[in-house]
Amino acid sequence: MVEGEASSPAFTIDYAVATGDWPAEDVLRGLVERAVTAAAARTDGPLQASLSVLFTDDAEMRALNARFRGKDKPTNVLSFPAPDSMVPPGTPRHFGDIALGYETVSREAKEEGKSFEHHLTHLVVHGFLHLAGHDHETEVEAEEMEQLEREILQSLAIGDPYA
């Protein structure tokens, strides 16, 4: 497992590459920082916080999905918002955790004719929006969240992921 830490302007990002044929660490770090910075600029989330990102495989994603969502299958991205808690002044609060499954992300990118990096960026944005309180349980929520994703990705010169 490869672990590290990076900082976007407002977020300290801890990342871990557990398993999978993920791109190089510097590529992942840059991608996550860009996605988080763009998404944070469009949400009402905290001005400063820490965030953890786990890059893993479908086996671990399946286990996490089963344990926390009751769905015994792998998925592309999972988000785990951190509970609101008191933190000392000047200490960034933990915003939450995002987990990504390599095989599913890779397969979806190929099936949808997207670059792996663009699809991964979309999923990091999607996961971040969940941490910020957005959801897609109803049609109205889904439309609002998808539109916000489009706007964030457009700011990163990435096309509409739903087109």
From Swiss-Prot:
User: Does the keyword field hold RNA-binding?
Assistant: no
Q: Which residues cross the membrane?
A: none
Give the main location: cytoplasm
Locate the residues binding Zn(2+): 126, 130, 136
> Which molecular function terms from Gene Ontology are attached?
metalloendopeptidase activity; RNA endonuclease activity; zinc ion binding
What's the stated role of this polypeptide? Single strand-specific metallo-endoribonuclease involved in late-stage 70S ribosome quality control and in maturation of the 3' terminus of the 16S rRNA.
Protein name as catalogued: Endoribonuclease YbeY
